[in-house]
Design a protein with these regions (language model features):
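Conserved aromatic beta-strand anchor motif in extracellular beta-sandwich/beta-rich domains
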Residues: 459-463
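Long, well-ordered core segments of solenoidal/helical folds
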Residues: 169-201, 231-253, 291-316, 355-380, ...
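Well-ordered alpha-helical segments within folded domains of soluble proteins
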Residues: 141-151, 162-166, 205-222, 268-285, ...
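Short, compositionally biased P/S/T/A/G/V-rich stretches that sit at domain boundaries
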Residues: 201, 423-444, 512-521
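Low-complexity, Ser/Thr/Pro/Gly-enriched N-terminal "stalk/linker" regions
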Residues: 31-209, 220, 224-257, 375
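Short proline/glycine-enriched turn/loop motifs at strand-loop junctions of beta-rich domains
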Residues: 451-456
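Glycine-centered tight-turn motifs at strand-turn-strand junctions
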Residues: 468-490
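Carbohydrate-binding/catalytic loop surfaces
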Residues: 183-203, 251-269, 314-336, 376-401
């Protein structure tokens, strides 16, 4: 059942006032999406829509990554963006967009109807931009700039036009009066199953990964013969995403991202997103009786044969083939993204009996076997090689992908680490007192212990019933100590407690002992 909160067209001030309360009203057990229908918007809880955590970009605090190249197409894109952002919609920027449309129409690579529609959408977006103020103007301005930057860089090709101009029109409709979304909110528009995500300062952005994850969820509901099966909606989603596929080179199509992220200049692609798309088209081909979906998927395989920044194939840190999360970041090795890329290629190879996809999987899977052990920090997982430890959501995502590799019987190592990482989520900490048993009065004495996982550790020292020492601190996995200076001789009771901080479950362990304190000499 959908949980719905309806919003009517309201003034900007009222919309902003309502945002914090009304848009937060839906439950969190399913993905949340704001559905736009004309001048109305509603937030729904939809089991097919991924949660924010499932499709989020790297966690806050992840190190920035360098762009894959500052020459060639990457440099052209960067210069075009700087020019597009340099002034308030100059005539040269507009002329570049018009010229791109006119060239495509003259060469009959787009229809006259598309030419007129997309030109009108662009003109209307610029007019709307001029009427807006503040943050709403900034969001729409960024999306207009994205179209102009493509045109200025001679990258507004006919295959990029559908996604670019539809995204522009979505933003033009949204920003004048609809409720201001929260960061990373997902938005869809009536009549379309495609998902956009709000990135502050960058407007509503087409998000291939969350859209293709939604497609896989819709397919799963149909395969399980659930009442919620929406085969028509799945067909609409995949048909629309087919029109948004970009001919990134003569060798392959891809689904691009159109915003700046962590040093990357658009348009860039994600191996994880494209592999999920390949998987989605392969799965739906038989269900929907659409064999041409297999050809769409096959056309996307070239990204995994092509080096960055055009494609996502690189050399992993263990020396084998690795598929990148971000085409602009050739040295960022994200464990969960790599596994999902492999799963998508494996599944399509099996479904379509496709030797090329199977070969791409087999070329890179040995690298994954070498990489996964280095994701383990002993009580949790890392997000990326030599990167930060994963937050709870990314640890669970990696565990799920490991379990998926295990159930597909792709290697015992994946089963081992899926079990291990599950243990890290549910096992209590193990706390062991390490000494000393004897010390001397007035001497600074370390109360030593070993703890098995990141925990808040508390030490209390009693003389009889009297508390004489108490300390609390956070310790990582391994050994730790509290410094205690006993004032006089006697027998003291030491009580230690540990509360793990990884899972939010607050699991605990305790240890106790006695220390004999001898008189100072």
């Amino acid at each position: 059942m959908l949980v719905v909160v309806r919003m009517c067209l309201v003034s900007r001030a009222l919309a902003l006032a309502l945002t914090a309360g009304v848009l937060a009203a839906a439950p969190a057990h399913a993905g949340q999406v704001i559905v736009v229908d004309g001048n109305h918007a509603k937030r729904v809880s939809d089991a097919d829509v991924p949660t924010k955590a499932q499709v989020a970009l790297p966690p806050a605090g992840a190190p920035s990554v360098a762009s894959a190249a500052r020459t060639g197409p990457a440099a052209v894109a960067s210069r075009a963006w700087r020019r597009a952002r340099s002034s308030a919609k100059p005539r040269a920027d507009r002329r570049a967009v018009y010229n791109a449309l006119e060239r495509a129409a003259r060469s009959k690579r787009i229809s006259q109807g598309s030419y007129r529609r997309w030109r009108r959408w662009y003109v209307n977006a610029v007019r709307t931009y001029r009427r807006l103020r503040g943050a709403r103007r900034d969001q729409l301005g960024y999306v207009i700039d994205s179209v102009e930057a493509l045109a200025l860089g001679h990258m507004l090709s006919p295959t990029r036009m559908p996604a670019a101009f539809v995204q522009l029109e979505r933003n033009r409709r949204y920003w004048p009066s609809l409720p201001f979304p929260a960061a990373r909110d997902q938005i869809s528009f009536k009549g379309s199953e495609v998902l956009y995500v709000y990135f502050p300062g960058e407007g509503l952005q087409l998000h291939p990964l969350t859209t293709f994850k939604k497609a896989n969820n819709m397919h799963g509901a149909c395969e399980r013969h659930e009442g919620a099966c929406d085969a028509a909606g799945l067909r609409r989603l995949l048909d629309e995403m087919e029109t948004f596929a970009v001919r990134r080179s003569r060798r392959f199509i891809a689904w691009e991202y159109g915003f700046h992220f962590d040093g990357g200049t658009p348009p860039w692609i994600s191996g994880m997103a494209d592999a999920t798309g390949i998987q989605a088209y392969g799965r739906a081909a038989d269900l929907l009786g659409e064999p041409h979906y297999l050809e769409v998927a096959r056309e996307a395989l070239g990204a995994f044969e092509t080096l960055p920044p055009l494609g996502v194939r690189t050399t992993g840190f263990a020396g084998g083939v690795h598929y990148l999360q971000y085409s602009f970041a050739p040295r960022l090795y994200i464990f969960n993204a790599f596994l999902q890329s492999l799963i998508g290629l494996h599944d399509f190879g099996r479904i379509a009996d496709d030797e090329r996809a199977t070969k791409l999987f087999e070329e890179a899977e040995p690298e994954a076997r070498e990489e996964i052990p280095l994701s383990d920090v002993g009580d949790w997982s890392r997000y990326s090689y030599r990167g930060p430890e994963a937050n709870h959501d990314y640890h669970e995502l990696l565990r799920e992908f490991l379990a998926s590799m295990c159930t597909r019987r792709l290697g015992e190592l994946y089963c081992e680490y899926a079990d291990r990482y599950r243990g890290y989520q549910v096992d209590p900490p193990e706390l062991t007192y390490m000494g000393p048993e004897v010390t001397t009065a007035k001497r600074l004495t370390p109360i030593r212990f070993e703890v098995s996982k990141l925990s808040a550790v508390e030490a209390k020292v009693y003389r009889g019933e009297k508390l004489v020492f108490s300390r609390l601190a956070t310790f990582r996995r391994g050994t730790g100590a509290f410094a205690w200076r006993p004032r006089g001789p006697g027998v003291f009771t030491v009580r230690l407690g540990a509360k793990e901080l990884r899972t939010g479950l607050g699991k605990k362990d305790r240890a106790a002992t006695e220390i004999s304190v001898e008189p100072a000499s």
